[in-house]
Amino acid sequence: MYDTVVIGGGPAGLAAAISANKEGAKVLLIEREPKLGGILKQCIHDGFGLITFKEKLSGPEYSERFIDKLFETDVEVKLLTFVTKIEKTENGFTIYFVNRDGASHVSTKTIVLATGCRERTARQIFIQGTRPSGVFTAGTAQNYVNLM
């Protein structure tokens, strides 16, 4: 059983996992993407890190610093993992998830939901019509540009 399961590996999830671990909790961090960092991976402008790291960093640089701090701990991380269900139990919660290893579940005393933000498609907000091939949301376009 975990003390804390953090769902989401963006800036808030990373900070929560590191803080909980620092307080002595046994922590699992679950992230649906192949990489940690969340929205920060898209923020190529600088200005991050002035307070925490005392220097001006881009979003990806800032997230890498937190990822490095995370991997200095014994927090368990599951990438490419999608939470399918959360059940309240007598002793906490059961979190069901699926990943490349198949379907599984874990028990935890507490949950931190740090699922972040992402843009929604026209269909998700009930705008009728079709999207032409090659048209992306701003966030998707930023992500592709930053990967190149």
For the regions a language model picked out, list residue spans one by one:
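FAD-binding core/adjacent interface of flavoenzyme oxidoreductases
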Residues: 1-5, 64-69, 73-148
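Beta1-alpha1 glycine-rich phosphate/pyrophosphate-binding loop at the start
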Residues: 2-65
